[in-house]
C-alpha cells in the first residue's frame, strides 16, 4: 500500500531511499542479505580503523599527561631542594644511617644472636631520626625511657603470672588491659604531652615482650635484645645527625623570630601606604576572607607571624634538648624568652591585622580627609616599621640595645598624630549632632545663636555656642549662612575618586519625603553615612596609636631576652661629632646632656 504523500510514513520512506542511494550508509536493516553483509563488512572495517586511531590517540594523550605530571613533580622537587638545601642533606643523612645499621646487621656485629631481632634497629632509625638534633634527642630519650620501663614492668608481670598456674594467660591478658588503659589515660594529661611518643613505645614494648616471652619462655632474652637493638639504632641516628652537617632547632627558632619581625614591619608599611594611596581591592580574595594562605604581601606578612605560634612552640620544645652550640653557649639557654618576645610581637601584629581590615572595609573615608592626616600617619608607620626592623636586626646579631631610646621617635610621631586628631577632630565626627553643642541657656533660633560668634557677648546674653564644645570644634569656622541649601550644595559638589569610593556615594534614597525639622531622609541618611565614613579614618588613626603603645611590651621582652641570653654589647663607632652605637646615631651634645641627666 502506497503511503500518502505528506504523511509521516511517506517522509520515512523518502529518507530511506536517499540513504540507499548513498551506498547504504544507514542504520536501517535491509532485506538484501548480500548487500547487508557487504555494508556491514565495510562499516566494521571503518569502525575498527577508527577505534584503533582513537585508542592510539588516547594512549598517547595519557603518556603525554604522565610525562607532564612527572616533569612538574621533578620541577617542584628541584625548587624545594634549591630553596632549602638542608632537606637534601637530611635525606642523605637518613639514608646513610640506614646503610650503617644494615651493614652492622649483615656482618652480625656486635652480637651474632641479635640478627633475628634486627628489625628493631631499622625501625628505630626510621622513627627516631628527625630533621633537627633536638627532635632526635627528644624522641631518642622517649624511646629509651619507654623501652626500659616497659621491659622492667613486663619482666615483673611475667614472674607474677607464674604464680597463677592455669590462670596465667588470663592474668597476662588483664595486665595488658590495665596497663593499656593507664598509659593511654596518662598521656592525655596536658603536662605529659611532651612524652606522648614515649607512652606509645611503652605500650608497644610491654605487649611485645609479654606476648613473645610467653610463647618462647625467654622473657629476659627478648627484653635485652630489644633494648640493645634500639640503643644501636638510636646511637647511629644521633651520631650521624650530630656530626654530619648538624641542623639545630634553636637556630631555626632564632631565625623564625627575626623573620617575624621583618614580616610585621613590611605589613605595617603596606597598610599605611595603601590607606594613604586609597588602595582599593576590586575583589577581596576569598582566601583572605576565610583566613587562608594568600599571596597578598600585606596579608601574608602579618599572617605568617600570627600563624607561627605552633611552630615556635615545637621548636622551643626541641631546642631545650640541644647541648650548647654556636653562639648559644650556655646550658639552660632562655629559649622560652624567644617565644615570649614573639608573643609580644604577635600582640602588635593583631593591630596590623585590624589596620588591614580598615582597607578591606566597605566603609571608607574620603581621600581629602585622609590627606589632612597624611604626614602624621606616614611618620608613625615609618617609625614603627623602622623600630621593628631594628629590633629584628638586634635579635639576628644578638646585640643589646644601646643608650638611645628606640621608642623616642615613634612616641614623638604618635604624639604629633594625637595632637593633629585633637586639632582636626571636627573632620572625624558630625559636629552638628553633638548634644552638648546644641544646648542653650534659653530658647532661640540657631541662626541667632551662631551670630553671637561675631560680637562680644554681653553679660545678660548666653555664652557663645562653641563654649560648650571641645577645643577642636572651636577652631572650626562655621559660616553664618550655613543651612539646608548650602549643605545640599556641598553634597552635590562632593568630588569622586577613581581609587576608592567612600560609603556615602552608594546611597539611593528618595528625597521627596520631609521630616519634622524640614530635612529630607536623603540628607539625614547622607549625614549618617558621612559620619560613619569619617569615623573609619578615626579608627585607622587610633589603631596606629594603639600599635605604638604595644611596642613597649616588645622592647621590654627584648631587653629581658638580651639579659638572660647574655647578648653582646653594641659596638661603638665614633665618626666626627657623632657617636654611632651599632647602627644608632646619637649627637655628641645629646650624649653629654644624657650623661648629666639633662
UniProtKB/Swiss-Prot annotation:
Tissue: Expressed in hypocotyls, leaves, roots, flowers, sepals and stamina. In leaves, expressed almost exclusively in mesophyll cells.
Cellular compartments annotated: Vacuole membrane
GO biological process: malate transport
Gene Ontology CC annotation, any one: plant-type vacuole membrane
Keywords: Chloride, Ion channel, Ion transport, Membrane, Transmembrane, Transmembrane helix, Transport, Vacuole
Transmembrane portions of the chain: 88-108, 117-137, 144-164, 170-190, 194-214, 227-247
InterPro entries, per database record: ALMT (IPR020966)
Null mutant phenotype: No visible phenotype.
Pfam families listed in its UniProt record: ALMT
Activity regulation info: Slow activation by external aluminum.
Main localization, broad class: membrane
Membrane topology: Multi-pass membrane protein
Keyword Transport set for record: yes
Top-level taxon of origin: Eukaryota
GO MF annotation list: monoatomic anion channel activity
Family: Belongs to the aromatic acid exporter (TC 2.A.85) family.
Annotated function: Vacuolar malate channel. Has a higher selectivity for malate than for fumarate. Also exhibits a weak chloride conductance.
Protein name as catalogued: Aluminum-activated malate transporter 9
Name of the gene this protein is made from: ALMT9
